[in-house]
Amino acid sequence: MKRLYILSLLIVLAACTTRPAQLRTGDLIFVGIPENYRIAGSMAEAISVSTNQDSLNIIHTAIADVRGDSVWIIDATIKHGVDRHPLDTFLNDFTLKDGSYPRFIVKRLKDNKDAERYVERARGYTGLGYNRCFVPCDTALYCTELVRDSYRRPDGSYIFSEAPMNFKAPDGTMPEYWTELFAILGMDVPQGIPGTNPRAMMEEECLKYVGPVSVLPQ
């Protein structure tokens, strides 16, 4: 009887042990920082304030490009523009001020059969600049704009939707960063113009949560 109990306990423990998932080509990596995390005067701060929900601010979206044992990241950032680089570069770019990592949330299309085609299209955008003004531009893309333009069906239609962009803080005020940035660009803040953002994209119905993956810090 005792032996049977121990065996049953071991089976239950084994069932409760979750193995890290494997990152696949086409997976989307969402970068989340603590709600109270601030980087004075940075775009990350402005994005986190304007997309603030729950206790985690989703500030960036990147595309995984897995080739054998090598993991590459395709994303659009101020530092690199639209670029394909090793995972280590991505992790280094998003290391927080105290040396820790943000939270990485991995999601995958529920219908992922065309992932290679989406990633191939994303690779074709490398070399473009970073779209700082967040309005359509032939020579630059911002992070979720890159994803939306890359993930299109065979007929050219978009998988991810657009919504009116919100640059305001939860209290309705406009962060100074955005006001100053767009003034330098000689334009008004494009509040309400159709676009995408990491938080809204992460919550799209076409995606499913993958869980912790072995190659990303937890």
Which stretches of residues belong to each language-model region?
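Active-site nucleophile-His-acid catalytic modules used for acyl/amide transfer and hydrolysis
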Residues: A46-I47, Y101-M165
